[in-house]
Amino acid sequence: MKKTQDGYVWRKGTGVRKGNLHCGGVVDPPERQTAPVDYIYDAVVIGAGYSGLMAARDMTDCGLSVLMLEARDRVGGRTYTVESDGFLYEMGGTWVTHHMAYLFQEMTRYKLDRDLILTHDRQYANDYYTINVPGATPRKLSHEEAGEITARAWNIFVNVDGQNCRAICPLPHAQLDNILVDRLEVERYDKISCRDRFEEIKHLLTPEEAGILTALLLHISGGSMENSSLWDMVRSHALMSYSPDNFGPIWTTFKLRQGQSALARAMFEEAVDNGLQYAFQTPIKSVIDETNVVKVTTTGGKQYRARRVVSTIPLNVLHTISFTPPLSPTRQQAIAIGHVNHMTKIHADVKGSDLTSWNGMRYPNLLMFGYGDGVTPSGNAHIVGFGKDERDVFVPERDPEKAIDAFQKLHPMEVEKMVFHNWNTDPWSQGGPAWWRPEFMSKYQDELQSRHGQVFFASADWAHGWRASIDGALEQGSQAALQIIRELKSACNKPVKARM
């Protein structure tokens, strides 16, 4: 298995080291270009995350000539798997579910829908939950009781319409302009922050409920209570079939046994079999749309031409790319604002297996939640810790001792190793998956989803339904590919797969 330049590992004896982690998503050699230098592709896809993979696979499958350009050395974008000491660590997106239609379709296509493993194993010694929040005595409790506390607080928080969100968000894949709810009514709720809503209902909550709810909202958004949109929580509730009982089954239970990079690699290899050309470790700096052809220039000075371009560049990175003609003022404003998710995710190998069955939370803390997630080949518990935006005081690769302290504040433990990716200091992400500010959806979603001449924008960061998730990335890549296929096949009558 090849090694990626991404990610960090901390060990007691060596400290923090960057990269050099085995990853099945690494593409080596990094280039395959057999087309002539002056070739005009049907499409250039910028980015090899799930949006880009979906678009490239679908377009090559329908006979279009496609070039993929990717800044990283691997497929997967903000979702990838590394192997260290015989154990798989999910560095970005992790959990899968049959509830996500686009994702389930891909899992089925590559026969991964039943090749799953479970995150939580209840057979180990510390089979309990710990809670530590202001105004309440820290304590141990059962996982079931912790779930009940969380569910009650969440239900009070999201029930903004008195009908468990079913009135205001009946069609979560069509939140704006659906046939049941007036857009102006949705926009009214979209103006509300999580802080605003929390202040409305906090008198109904116990200290434990208030603390765990606050931490959960920040865990989800990766931002602050003030800059996190209430609507994003309403949307999430609707997507979970209007029940917090589905938090676990949908968001934190099932993983691909072979890892996310196995799925990403399968999509990539099928596209390659269909004739996909590609260049990895190839950042771009500009996109020039000349109507009949679009020119994409790399930071290394190479230029590629295509009839269409699919940009899957994350929202928080788009400001680094020059577009000609300029993007609309509305899109430029959205890009300047960006999204709020600057979360932290750190894997820890903890001495002994006892904490494998433990989950817990502490707020405030640099890592608010910890989840037991399997046993390493050496017999240690694998714990995953999550925190909100702490960029001003915490940079994990610079402050590993703060990370260890945060784990130990969640529960006494001896951390022997940490594995992580800092998406906030990563130039190709500049944050995690997109969670939005109040009013951002109302003002900018339509524009972010729209095309700009012959340039299509496809990213989970502005998906219709599962925004910020793998499913949303696949949705956006699929929709961009479908439109380009229709346009180009109509113009050129290409019925078969292309081979260079």
Where are the regions that the model predicts?
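Active-site/ligand-binding neighborhood in enzyme catalytic cores
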Residues: 173-283, 312, 322
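Glycine-rich FAD pyrophosphate-binding loop
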Residues: 60-84
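N-terminal Rossmann-like FAD-binding beta1-loop-alpha1 element of flavoenzymes
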Residues: 38-68
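Core beta-strand elements of the Rossmann-like FAD/NAD(P) dinucleotide-binding domain
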Residues: 39-41, 299-308
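Flavin (primarily FAD) binding-site architecture
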Residues: 309-330
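Mobile amphipathic helical/loop "lid" adjacent to a hydrophobic cofactor/ligand pocket
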Residues: 2-11, 15, 118-228
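Conserved flavin/dinucleotide-binding core of flavoenzymes
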Residues: 2-30, 293, 358-500
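A conserved short coil-to-beta-strand element within the FAD-binding core of flavoproteins
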Residues: 280-295
